[in-house]
Amino acid sequence: MALSQGLLTFRDVAIEFSQEEWKCLDPAQRTLYRDVMLENYRNLVSLDISSKCMMKEFSSTAQGNTEVIHTGTLQRHERHHIGDFCFQEMEKDIHDFEFQWKEDERNSHEAPMTEIKQLTGSTNRHDQRHAGNKPIKDQLGSSFHSHLPELHMFQTEGKIGNQVEKSINSASLVSTSQRISCRPKTHISKNYGNNFLNSSLLTQKQEVHMREKSFQCNESGKAFNYSSVLRKHQIIHLGAKQYKCDVCGKVFNQKRYLACHRRCHTGKKPYKCNDCGKTFSQELTLTCHHRLHTGEKHYKCSECGKTFSRNSALVIHKAIHTGEKSYKCNECGKTFSQTSYLVYHRRLHTGEKPYKCEECDKAFSFKSNLERHRKIHTGEKPYKCNECSRTFSRKSSLTRHRRLHTGEKPYKCNDCGKTFSQMSSLVYHRRLHTGEKPYKCEECDEAFSFKSNLERHRRIHTGEKPYKCNDCGKTFSQTSSLVYHRRLHTGEKPYKCEECDEAFSFKSNLERHRIIHTGEKLYKCNECGKTFSRKSSLTRHCRLHTGEKPYQCNECGKAFRGQSALIYHQAIHGIGKLYKCNDCHQVFSNATTIANHWRIHNEERSYKCNRCGKFFRHRSYLAVHWRTHSGEKPYKCEECDEAFSFKSNLQRHRRIHTGEKPYRCNECGKTFSRKSYLTCHRRLHTGEKPYKCNECGKTFGRNSALIIHKAIHTGEKPYKCNECGKAFSQKSSLTCHLRLHTGEKPYKCEECDKVFSRKSSLEKHRRIHTGEKPYKCKVCDKAFGRDSHLAQHTRIHTGEKPYKCNECGKNFRHNSALVIHKAIHSGEKPYKCNECGKTFRHNSALEIHKAIHTGEKPYKCSECGKVFNRKANLSRHHRLHTGEKPYKCNKCGKVFNQQAHLACHHRIHTGEKPYKCNECGKTFRHNSVLVIHKTIHTGEKPYKCNECGKVFNRKAKLARHHRIHTGKKH
């Protein structure tokens, strides 16, 4: 039995939107609309694909090359040849409509319907027979015309070559009475036939009779299949938008568009999901939502294979692979991969907050934020933890909470290796390394690393305390303060010590308690070196040095260092009620605080050390203290069996074996195993020297250096060498000295195998290989490998000469120069040359002298090839090539290439003549002049002419004499 086909147009399955309604749709809804329309289109075409197919041919006309679309009828038995081709042509036809509509939209911004005239006729391709010549888009119905423009919205915008497709006069070729008649063959598959039987889209007729376009527009001449479509079309010419919204005044050209728009105001959501009961205002949104339940994901990424339920989600995902960010903010230049992201971002600049809460009138920039906020009023918490049954209002909060049970910390800091359970915690943590403080208070310009800290800080200025205790009515500026306060009423103590099982209400109390077990005092005063176990104790102590008094009386303006002192003072003015402790005389403003304070004294009397009589608040404190008497060391290292009294000491020790150095310097990248080492190291960059000597005022970067320095003033040297009797102020100095006797050199360089008796000497030596010069002069930017060299160099700029000769009162920049100078007064020359017996005051002078005998000159000038026996001589020689003169006279500004020349020059200004002749008492500025002068008394003439044997007392006279033999005048 043959199946008959009924009349079906694209209108029967189409969903229509006006341009106004179309603009209200977000990108995801538009993508879904496009997908549904295309799917309906394909379904309709597939039902009649073999009998109606559009094929394009290009033919030359009188007007030039024009694209002509021919439609015809193919026999069912030819379907396997052209099926795919036909469908591709139909899809291309869609794009023709899309581009045409785009141009019309640019030119007129009017109606979404566009007319494209098609030239229809017969073609003999594949020897097909034609039963009619109407284009398939006419066969599908005029509704299809009005929807093709919407399909264009998801095409990439670009320039269209031809603004408007030229119409072709085809009136003579097309008859309005033509019909398309298709009789399908009986060899259709059984399954396909069943689909036809079950489809509600088909009627029991054998032929499809497409309606004539009998309704024509008088203005444009355009014809339509239905009168209703004609009426909608005529609105374009009238320019009328007859349906107006009573709420916002927006007008629409069709009543159903207005009905759809009104749901924005009424909140009506007539489309309900049968699976979860969720409702939607549009059918398209419901269709998209259904895919969440079915799990349908037919959009696949060709790059990574990931699938998506929406095409819009796939488009967004593809931007990850391409890295494309085509949407740019005109305000700040930031780019985005999606236009919606740009829209959201612009609200940061405009301050727009279009989403308002009906309960409290609070406004939000994003709809998602409003939805989360609404749960505060409703109390809805749909997300439940399977472990502890705790509920949450957000799924992300539940995900973060689950990590408390699993211990998962997927976010790792690249700087120190610390891991975090939340990405936000890692972002905040990174600011500790970078020092970034992006949040600034407008009132006082104080900056903060975290936004929450800024918000809490602002309440200082506003005095706002929005968090109230339901038990006692007390208000707080922070929710955390309220949570802590409630524990006073509930007695909850969630923080427990692993060592002694003591519990605490607050984590900070537990942290302070742990210090009892470790004995650690992390907080150190930079002024006097005193250490404290609590930061608050250090803060109070520092006020002794700074003189800061932050607690001020509002009545008289008097300021105090401590809050208790202010409370006690305010009693004079009759402000508040004072509670005084009879044991320590400390005062408190309320009974609760003093009650907590009394426990300290009561507990102090509970636990006493039988050995030394010391009292402790807790038994655990006493247990830790007892180790100082018993020598007990319960914490043992598994690697080397070394034992420790405190767990923290063991943890620090383990880093020796693991090599872990979690503390990194942001300036130079150097890492350290302890935070205290990093703190000391940073002072090299900052130049900070917080430790000051009370005797001479000299400052130091480390407390240990100050202690060593103080021994200079006291003269105390308790450490004595048993070999030679030499005494030292430090034990480490004695240890290093003993290696002179034993010859031990335990520190070896891996580069050159050179060995050293001190580790510091090895570290300094390594810089020769690495070229590292970490110590930089702030005045001239010159860098040095040793801090001592920088200190010596700095004296050139400051003119400081701290080393004074007790004999003549002369000052020197370097101690070595003073030692050399003292030999002048003593006449001592302990260093003797084995070759010639000549003696020298300094070992360096002897080494230089030895080069005369060996002839060795290892230092060569790369410019001229001249060789020198001393590196210093080569450095001075280099300045002849470079012209560098780093030594400047502070009096007249004259510059010199050698420091010795500057020193000699200074004597011109000072009139100093330190070199005196012992024979006649005459004085000289330069030693060389004195040496020449002495030859007058001795008669010595050491300079002999090789030509004639004549002798001279000065080298310059010999040089002049040589010219007589050579004949040179200069």
UniProtKB/Swiss-Prot annotation:
PROSITE patterns: KRAB (PS50805), ZINC_FINGER_C2H2_1 (PS00028), ZINC_FINGER_C2H2_2 (PS50157). A zinc finger (C2H2-type) spans 215-237, 243-265, 271-293, 299-321, 327-349, 355-377, 383-405, 411-433, 439-461, 467-489, 495-517, 523-545, 551-573, 579-601, 607-629, 635-657, 663-685, 691-713, 719-741, 747-769, 775-797, 803-825, 831-853, 859-881, 887-909, 915-937, 943-965. Residues 8-81 form the KRAB domain. GO terms for biological process: regulation of transcription by RNA polymerase II. SUPFAM superfamilies: beta-beta-alpha zinc fingers, KRAB domain (Kruppel-associated box). This is Zinc finger protein 845. It holds the Pfam family zf-C2H2. It comes from Homo sapiens. SMART domains: KRAB, ZnF_C2H2. It is found in: Nucleus. There is a cross-link at K205 (Glycyl lysine isopeptide (Lys-Gly) (interchain with G-Cter in SUMO2)). GO terms for molecular function: DNA binding; zinc ion binding. Coiled coil: none annotated. Belongs to the krueppel C2H2-type zinc-finger protein family.
